[in-house]
Amino acid sequence: MKNGLTRVFTIFFFLVLSFSLNFAQVEELENSSQDMLIKSEVETAVSMLRAIFVKHEAGEMSLEEAKKLGADLLRELKYGEDGYFWADTEEGVNVVLYGRKDVEGKNRLEAKDEHGTFFIKELLAAGAKDGGGYVEYWFTKKGKSIAEAKRSYVLLFKPFGWVVGTGYYR
């Protein structure tokens, strides 16, 4: 009897362990897929900014006109159900933040998330790296009052001095 119970317990233990590992792998795979999506979306947005900058270089518009056109583009550019973009200058001044025109033009460098992280500083640092980077922080979703865990990808568009990003809530 004792030997049978030991076997049942051992099998049960390994089934639970196997399920837990598989669940973690599925979650990791989902996050990896989301990471690839947001990186691709930011790279696409930056390539659109690059096309605008090329028009500036060709003398078709001033740098200020190109930046305004770029900001207007990012403000309206969406993907999926609720994907949007934002941009901050390398100094932390917000250029575009979806649904938050009240923030545009304001320096967000000292902004902290719910855990005391200077998330704008981290986003700017990650964006300045060659190839951009990912940052995890807490942010309040539009229409909500409680901050949620968020993972973002950011990339510097050097000609405008903007760090462009998007992210997903975990």
Labelled PLM ranges:
Residues 1-170:
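N-terminal membrane-sensor/transducer module of prokaryotic signaling receptors
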